[in-house]
Curated annotation (Swiss-Prot):
Ribonucleoprotein as UniProt keyword: no
Pfam families, per database record: Thioredoxin_8
Name under which the protein is recorded: Nucleoredoxin-like protein 1
Keywords: Cell projection
GO biological process: photoreceptor cell maintenance
Organism of derivation: Homo sapiens
UniProt biased composition (Gly residues): 197-212
Subcellular location: Cell projection, Cilium, Photoreceptor outer segment
PROSITE patterns hit by this protein: THIOREDOXIN_2 (PS51352)
Coiled-coil regions listed in the entry: none
Length: 212
C-alpha cells in the first residue's frame, strides 16, 4: 500500500498537521489496513451531504468510544478543492485520524485518473496490498453503514487473510453459499489498471469529469 504514496508526503488532520514524510512512516500508518481514498471537495453539494455519513462511519469504526479496538481502517482525503483555503476549511471539522495529500501535490489529480473517478463524492476501497475492492464505497457506506466494513474485510480475507492470525486459518468451517456472490461483487482489480466498474455512472451533477 505504501508504494501508492512512494516519495509523497501524507499529512495527519490534527492540530499540528504532522507530516508522514518517509516511506516507513507511511507504511506503519497504512499497513494491514483497508484504505479508503475519499475524493471530494468542499464546494460540492453532494460531498457536503455525504460527509456527515462518512464521518459517522469512520468514527464508529475507529473511535474507542464506540469500539473496544479500532478497526483496521485508514482514510486518505484526495482533495479536489479549487484552492488550499477551501481544502483547509473542508478538513477543519473532519476526524483527526484522517490523512490527506498536500494541496500542491499533483497526485491528487493523478489518483482521480488512475481510479477512473467520474463524479464526486467517491470512495475507492483498497486492500492492504493496494488492490481495489470496490469503487462504489460511497454508495455502500450510505446504504449499509458500518456493516459494509465487515463485507470489505471478509472480501480481503478471501485472498490474503490479512486480518487473521495463523491459528485462525486452521480447521475453518466451509463458507456460506453466498461467498461466490461476494467474490464476484468485490472482484479484485489491480490498482494500476484503473479500469471502470460495470454500471459506473458519469455525467451527473457533482461529476468530476473535468477535474482530472
Amino acid at each position: 500500500m505504501a508504494s501508492l504514496f512512494s516519495g509523497r508526503i501524507l499529512i495527519r488532520n490534527n492540530s499540528d498537521q504532522d507530516e508522514l514524510d518517509t516511506e516507513a512512516e507511511v507504511s506503519r500508518r497504512l499497513e494491514n489496513r483497508l484504505v479508503l481514498l475519499f475524493f471530494g471537495a468542499g464546494a460540492c453539494p453532494q460531498c457536503q451531504a455525504f460527509v456527515p455519513i462518512l464521518k459517522d462511519f469512520f468514527v464508529r469504526l475507529t473511535d474507542e468510544f464506540y469500539v473496544l479496538r479500532a478497526a483496521q481502517l485508514a482514510l486518505v482525503y484526495v482533495s479536489q478543492d479549487s484552492t488550499e483555503e477551501q481544502q483547509d476549511l473542508f478538513l477543519k471539522d473532519m476526524p483527526k485520524k484522517w490523512l490527506f495529500l498536500p494541496f500542491e501535490d499533483d497526485l491528487r489529480r493523478d489518483l482521480g485518473r488512475q481510479f477512473s473517478v467520474e463524479r464526486l463524492p467517491a470512495v475507492v476501497v483498497l486492500k492492504p496490498d493496494g488492490d481495489v475492492l470496490t469503487r462504489d464505497g460511497a454508495d455502500e457506506i450510505q446504504r449499509l453503514g458500518t456493516a459494509c466494513f465487515a463485507n470489505w474485510q471478509e472480501a480481503a480475507e478471501v485472498l490474503d487473510r490479512n486480518f487473521q492470525l495463523p491459528e485462525d486459518l486452521e480447521d475453518q468451517e466451509p463458507r456460506s453459499l453466498t461467498e461466490c456472490l461476494r467474490r464476484h461483487k468485490y472482484r479484485v482489480e489491480k490498482a494500476a489498471r484503473g479500469g471502470r466498474d460495470p454500471g459506473g455512472g458519469g455525467g451527473e451533477e457533482g461529476g468530476a469529469g473535468g477535474l482530472f
